[in-house]
Amino acid sequence: RDWFYLGEDGQIVKNAKIDEYYVDDEGKMVTNAWVELKNEEDPDSPETPDAFWYYFEKDGKSAVSKWVKFDSRWYYFDEAGHMATGKTEIDGATYYLGTEKDGFMRTGWVRLEENSHAPGASESWYYFNSDGKMVTTQYDKKIDGSYYTFIDGKMQTGWVLMPSKSDVTDSNAASPKI
């Protein structure tokens, strides 16, 4: 058995998002499926994509404000049900969720442009732990046997003003290894 949505005229609705559900080209409710839908919210804005990806779960509802594991990769869907991409803050932690083309959570080293809309934008290295959370400010993060310094998530190079042991009061910060 399949679920169909009937419009006010009694006809089967096709290719439409109805509340948190989606019906395909036959009018059947979609389950366990990815669907890319055109951006109807603000299609002319340069900051928003032309389309959004949704994931409709086994009950037919779109994933909303939650993580979904699909083919061994983790994806996050925001409060509108859109697949989140790029650097995204979730519950106080920052994650990198790829591009609009793939959207899955990254771990390890990722090189990102600071401002992709600016000409000559610079790039910085970031590190995402095995749980996907970005290392924010840490003065002695050991990765593969080497120590790195991160401030606001960016790996530091060159001259860096680091706190002395007496300046470090944050329980999450550690003394620098010099």
Predicted regions and their residues:
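Extracellular adhesion/carbohydrate-binding repeat motifs centered on closely spaced tryptophans
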Residues: 1-178
